[in-house]
Amino acid sequence: QGSGAQERIDQYVENAGSLMESFVRDTDGDGVWDTGVVIMGITFDMSDTEIPPRDDPKGITEDNPSGQIKDHKAFLSYADLLIHEESRPEDCELCHRVYESPTHSWDLERADVIPNREAVTITGLTPVLHDVSDAIYDELMDVMLPLSLLFVGIMMFALHRNAKVILICGTPIIMTLFITFGTIVITDRMLTPMIISAGPILVGLGVDYALHLTNRIEENRVRILEQRAERNWALRRDGQPEHDLDPWDPSISLGATVSAALTTGHAILLSALTTIIGFSVLMWPSIVPIAPMRTVGLTLLLGIFTTFIVSMVMVPALVQLLRYRKTPSAAFDSLWDKIGEVPVRVYLLVLIIAGAFTAYGVMILDDELGKEITGSADEVPPGLASYEALREYSIEFQGGQTNMFIVDAEARGELNGTAPIRDLPILDAIERMQIEVNNVPNTTSISLVDILKAIHVDSQSLGINLVSTSLWDLIHDECWDESQNPFRPDCLPYAITSREAMVNVAFDTLSPEIRSMLMNADQAGVCQQSSPCETKTLVYVNQPYIALKEAGVLRGAIDDHLRGESSCNGPLSCSALGLDGAVNSLLTGGLPVSLDINEGIHDAQRDTTLSTILILLVVMSILFRSPRMAVFTMAAVGVVVLWQPILMRFGGVNVNVFTAMIGTIVFGIGVDDSIHIVDRIKDEGESPAGIAKSVARCGQTVFETTATTCAGLAAGLFVAIPGLRNFFVLMMALLFLALVASSIVLPTIVVAYRELASRLMGRGPWLDYEESGSLSAGFKSN
């Protein structure tokens, strides 16, 4: 204020130099700054801050009797309240301005999804993550869940032509989901978008268990009624009174249910045990270091166990209570009779086609599944102001991806009368490191050095005759070394103080906010020295949001500079500074964490898949009492995993946080389908007719469960998030392939093995209908 205020401000801005580019930009090229940023730093734990609390989503609990919490979300709500609601237009006109038409800084290609732009928008990684999570939750609950229930009901009615099946299959599924996810929330487990992957598995297995059991009970009921009808014909022929053919006779219902429990129930038990043991791998910290993935593993274990118990108890009771009878469809049954003959009659053709696709999938496996997990705009719900503002900031300021490295001089101690970080050799070493880091493309850095260079002082007030002196230039002036030289009269004023004292003056000039964001705070009661105890400082490294693959190269280049000429003793102890007692860390922050999580997810997927295959082979060999059938079962599941890269390449699906867990889902449902087919083949016998009947009967149920699960997933096509839509499309395609693998490929492998073994042992063709009977005859005899 006062006379010359604007001139002084202009001088401050001019003195700041390139540092201003980090805070203001001219986006339309008219020479006037029109866009600026205010950078805020927040602590991880907000509980001791003075922000208003928000309601705890968990309500009043023993750990939180007030039902109120202070966290980042509460801070963001408070900041938004201060800016947009409690600010007065006369004090902050910008706070109430809204741009309804595109500005120069908008991405015009996304103009159709960008909301009306507030002139002041709170953005950054934390607000975006909260907004994305809330939007995904709203999409799933408000759009997908109602449509999913509707589509599942329609599909069940279309397949069974009886609305009662919706209650029989839907009730156990809903109970399982409530019990499982309720338990996860009550136990306060970490929840992330990855938990979405557990839903389709539990729904798929729930439908699978319920339909297999329901259809087998109905199949047994029909068989018992046919047997009684034959006996009635004999009684009628002999003139004796006939038995009542009531399908709900207690003895008939009991016989049908017990027989189903001993056959299909056995297969369901094998499936539940196998999938529980297989998914237990996701909970091993040695293989899965990522906590959200372990939460998925726990959810699956609890959910599968609950699904098995609830289905086995409730389905028979609901069938009897509702008096459910499946309306037969002669055309559908006839179609599956024909499909059942495919593995027997054209097994060579099936093997050739499946082998060709599998070989191609192996060829492109590393290319497709080895891709970096993306975080593109397609995976963000449209219309999020915080995301659009962050995208705009990344483009205009070439920043937004905030990284940093730590300089730690604690071991160096107090030298030259200053705190460790204030020591001039430390500051000079930081400047040298910044020069190297800034030479990396798309990279700029900010540190204490830049702040000291940007702040200019009136040297005349200090008794020193310099013009336009920055704090950095002042503490590096050569006159500090010549202050006692009589031949340098210009340096005599420097004798009244010392360079070290001037360094402290320079640092004390910085505001508490600047110092708190760049250095660790003074430790009251810990520090035993007169000078401040600043021992660490942050050097911020800014980059725009770019593809992780490209950003990974930049991260590697920066880390090479931070390692220096010698190797590091861990990520926090590198010697690039070249000073005793001073170390620096490797790069940390948003980009390195994203890259490490990306690598961790890929490694965990690979390790869990391999571990699951080995464990399931052992478990199924024991449960089936046949290593051969265990290998056949895993082969059928494995080909689906190997077909996934083909779908991703030709379907244009990328690897993102949603699709990253698809392999786990397919494994869970694929193993279940294959176990049911194998168990039915064991019941019917490994003969051409037995295999054909197993496919015709059990394969039909597998088709019904697949169709029902896909109907539920089809609701995902109506969500507004392209990344989620890709997830559900790929999920449905892989479930269909799992159906093909279990119902066609698996029986074909059994037929091919039997045929080859028979010929090698000199017994002639195994597919000899003269000895084993025709397929149709085999159906009737069974």
Q: Can you name each region flagged by the protein language model?
A:
Residues 39-41, 121, 406, 538, ...:
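Soluble periplasmic/extracytoplasmic beta-strand elements of cell-envelope proteins
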Residues 340, 347-350, 354-492:
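Juxtamembrane segments of multi-pass membrane proteins
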Residues 35, 399, 533, 579-581:
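Short flexible coil/turn linkers enriched for glycine and charged/polar residues
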Residues 1-63, 74-77, 81, 90-114, ...:
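Extracytoplasmic
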Residues 47, 63, 67-70, 78-378, ...:
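Membrane-embedded transmembrane helical bundles of large multi-pass transporters/channels
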Residues 47-77, 380-383, 414-431, 546-556, ...:
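Solvent-exposed, non-transmembrane alpha-helical starts
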